[in-house]
């Protein structure tokens, strides 16, 4: 338990990654996916609400649709800020990769829990809804692997 906490919350933050290399390699496509997702919410005219998540905006009043789009775009900005931290960790502070897998897993679990109690009405299953559980499972596996010391030495610079 002491090793886990020390790995999650290192006394010194460095660019030395302590875990299994597969978790480091998987962190790259995860970060790319997060970047794409956040940019789509910011750039898409509907914030991805109808075009991706299949929320029936065309059945809403103009004001209600505009509010949903604004919330999606603001959510995209929040996601982009978190994504920039993921990029910073990947490039400069790799010792924090285990912590960021934990943050991602907690965020995924929280999103699923909130969605269970406050579901979003969509015409079809939104990509986010269908990918949440696989991403949570993958994040937990990568978290476990990132907490296991690397046998071949540390991955850095």
Regions found by a protein language model. Name each.
Residues 7-18:
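Cytosolic juxtamembrane amphipathic/interface segments immediately preceding
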Residues 32, 52-87:
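Core segments of alpha-helical transmembrane spans in multipass integral membrane proteins
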Residues 137-155:
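Membrane-water interface at the C-terminal end of transmembrane alpha helices
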Residues 33-36, 105-115:
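Aromatic-anchored segments of alpha-helical transmembrane domains
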Residues 53-55, 121-134:
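Non-cytosolic membrane-interface motifs at loop->transmembrane helix junctions
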Residues 18-44:
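N-terminal signal-anchor transmembrane alpha helix
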Residues 83-98:
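Juxtamembrane helix-break-helix junctions at the cytosolic face
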Residues 101-111, 129-139:
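Hydrophobic alpha-helical segments of small multi-pass membrane proteins
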């Amino acid at each position: 338990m002491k090793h886990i906490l020390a790995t999650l919350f290192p006394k010194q933050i460095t660019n030395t990654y302590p875990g299994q290399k597969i978790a480091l390699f998987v962190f790259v496509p995860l970060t790319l996916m997060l970047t794409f997702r956040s940019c789509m919410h910011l750039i898409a005219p509907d914030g991805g609400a109808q075009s991706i998540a299949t929320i029936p905006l065309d059945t809403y009043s103009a004001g209600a649709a505009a509010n949903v789009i604004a919330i999606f775009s603001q959510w995209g900005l929040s996601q982009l800020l978190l994504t920039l931290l993921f990029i910073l960790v990947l490039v400069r502070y790799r010792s924090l990769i285990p912590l960021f897998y934990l943050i991602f897993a907690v965020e995924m679990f929280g999103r699923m829990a909130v969605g269970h109690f406050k579901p979003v009405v969509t015409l079809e299953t939104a990509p986010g809804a269908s990918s949440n559980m696989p991403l949570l499972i993958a994040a937990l596996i990568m978290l476990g692997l990132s907490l296991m010391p690397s046998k071949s030495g540390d991955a850095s610079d």
